[in-house]
């Protein structure tokens, strides 16, 4: 039995746009194509996973600067109003949009903010004024029910008191969950990550869109935009990207040219902040020989993301994990590991049998073979000292 743990294109499914519908399937297919065509050259997936920290920030920050056309097109805060119907579209009902935080289906026609208005995920008062690109960026300014938007104000996101938690949407002091039974914690985290990546600076890297108020690590706590980096990464990991986010990412790219990499590749967040968080080494065990990218072996305490595929390229239907919390999407084979409490053991059953040797061109995969740690590079096996394995 051979279980490969690899990264593939694809993220998640949410409750308001089921993959079973023809519209959702078509939208997901379009997403995969647009995602694959956007990351080219030194920004292809395999290349991004080989770098981290400031180097990774610089590469993606440059990509954002090169592809974002907000300023070139002369877009403004008012430009967003009529564009939402093509960006935040409700896959179930034409002409309607999905509201931020509550997941409600709203009319896509602008009614002078009587029903919905525009929510600055990164508040205007904390650096994203509507007069500058960051303040009218389609990726981060979202259509939101008027009452819900008023409830949040400019409060920083977080779980403790004095913070705003999108899992506890309140109107007139009455709390309720999002209408699609989903969560907007991860959505909010990924927008904040995006704003930092596009408009911030790190390690000497910044593009022409730089905004000195977009320095995430200086914007933590009640006076900032997030309670802590640890809570942000936790939300990002525990609430993976949904189909609605994917559809929105495509629409935002159509509108202004650039994408949100944290929706396309959630893994890059862990690599980007590796040196800002304590690093934990996880012992990951499988019930069969396996390959796993070494970056997943050392990551932040928030966890890691991997993709499970059997020898025939199918995703196992049955998977369990001990030693950690986990979320598994069998449709995509995506496994999100959270709340690690010890050695992580992943058990997979009912997969294709294969006793033949499988080679791969994937860079720097790590796995165990006959009790020895092996690193695969360009189809050649090396030991931990870099010597070819005979």
Where are the model-predicted features located?
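Secondary-structure capping and domain/repeat boundary segments
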Residues: 278-352
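Short, glycine-anchored, charge-dense loop/turn motifs used at functional sites
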Residues: 382-387
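Hydrophobic h-region of N-terminal signal peptides that target proteins for export
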Residues: 2-10
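N-terminal module-boundary/linker segments of secreted carbohydrate-active enzymes
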Residues: 11-103, 271-272
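Residue-level detector of functionally pivotal "anchor" positions at catalytic/ligand-binding pockets or at interdomain
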Residues: 277-283, 349-377
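Domain-level detector of nuclease and nuclease-like folds
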Residues: 110-117, 122-278
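Short, His- and charge-rich active-site/binding loops that engage polyanionic ligands
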Residues: 97-108, 112-115
